[in-house]
Amino acid sequence: MNKIRKGDEVIVITGKDKGKRGVVLAVGENRVTVEGLNIAKKHVKPNPMKGTTGGVEAKAMPLNISNVALVDANGKPSRVGIKVEGDKKVRFLKTTGAVLSA
């Protein structure tokens, strides 16, 4: 069970974007892509077959999953725990104890 999932609001705790918040767009093996953070400029070749024009576009690049933390209701970073309720595993915030949606 992944502790951080697509759609979670996270805050960056280390790196050039430290303190910034965003929503998780994608989760990989050990990496997460966060909307509007860790932006890099990628050069794109024009492709007349697809109808794309060339140029330089800004793209959100993945961050290491250890560099982000979930945001609790108070707006502070929180670690995530996993506990069993009934027959299902649920995620909860360690700062407030609030259960996250399954």
From Swiss-Prot:
Cystine pairings recorded for this chain: none
Pfam families xrefs: KOW (PF00467), ribosomal_L24 (PF17136)
Example GO molecular function: rRNA binding
TM regions (residue ranges): none
Function description: One of two assembly initiator proteins, it binds directly to the 5'-end of the 23S rRNA, where it nucleates assembly of the 50S subunit. One of the proteins that surrounds the polypeptide exit tunnel on the outside of the subunit.
Similarity comment text for this entry: Belongs to the universal ribosomal protein uL24 family.
Name used for this protein in its record: Large ribosomal subunit protein uL24
Organism for this UniProt entry: Paraburkholderia phymatum (strain DSM 17167 / CIP 108236 / LMG 21445 / STM815) (Burkholderia phymatum)
Underlying gene: rplX
